């Protein structure tokens, strides 16, 4: 279901990338309170219109992301910036379902684009919650971005965001990181 509406979906974005995001992949959003989650529900920031317009809504490609990487690249930096934040868990869905959300004219509403974070450093890092891992290269190859596939009018934006929110809901209860991501380092 990759399409011309999302040209970046058609090629991997870095040599070290595991490849383009496939329809069968699981896509996860890490939920930090109060940013993405508050009062047992998603906040408006969870599916930020601004980030979606800029193609900067960060998500994880589950099959290409470890628990270590989630803590190191996503959770710990957020908690360090603001110790009042709290890890809630993970909301996840299948990529093809994200790509299937359409506008009132039948056009795709969202793109899911491979966007690995590649850096080099072989230090050992404490990643929190009693987990220690050896992120040898500290690469976060399972990082991806979501974006709107096109310019949408305000009503279509609201409808698309609402549909995306419903898709990521899993009985209104987030999963734990340990239940979703593999342990391997």
Features from the language model and the residues they span:
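Conserved NAD+-utilizing ADP-ribose enzyme module
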Residues: 1-24, 47-55, 63-185
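Compositionally biased, non-globular sequence tracts
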Residues: 28-29
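Short aromatic-glycine-(Arg/Gly/Cys) micro-motifs in beta-strand/loop hairpins
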Residues: 34-50
């Amino acid at each position: 279901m990759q399409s011309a509406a999302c040209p970046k979906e058609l090629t991997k974005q870095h040599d070290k990338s595991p490849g383009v995001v496939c329809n069968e992949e699981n896509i996860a959003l890490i939920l930090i309170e109060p940013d993405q989650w508050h009062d047992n529900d998603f906040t408006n920031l969870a599916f930020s219109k601004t980030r979606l317009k800029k193609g900067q809504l960060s998500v994880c490609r589950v099959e290409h992301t470890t628990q270590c990487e989630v803590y190191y690249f996503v959770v710990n930096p957020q908690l360090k910036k603001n110790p009042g934040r709290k890890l809630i868990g993970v909301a996840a869905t299948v990529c093809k379902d994200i790509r299937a959300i359409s506008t009132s004219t039948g056009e795709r509403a969202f793109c899911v684009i491979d966007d690995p974070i590649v850096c080099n450093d072989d230090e050992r890092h404490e990643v929190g919650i009693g987990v220690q891992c050896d992120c040898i290269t500290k690469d976060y190859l399972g990082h991806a971005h979501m974006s709107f596939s096109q310019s949408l009018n305000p009503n279509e934006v609201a409808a698309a965001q609402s549909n995306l929110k419903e898709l990521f809901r899993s009985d209104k209860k987030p999963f734990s990181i340990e239940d979703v991501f593999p342990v391997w380092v």
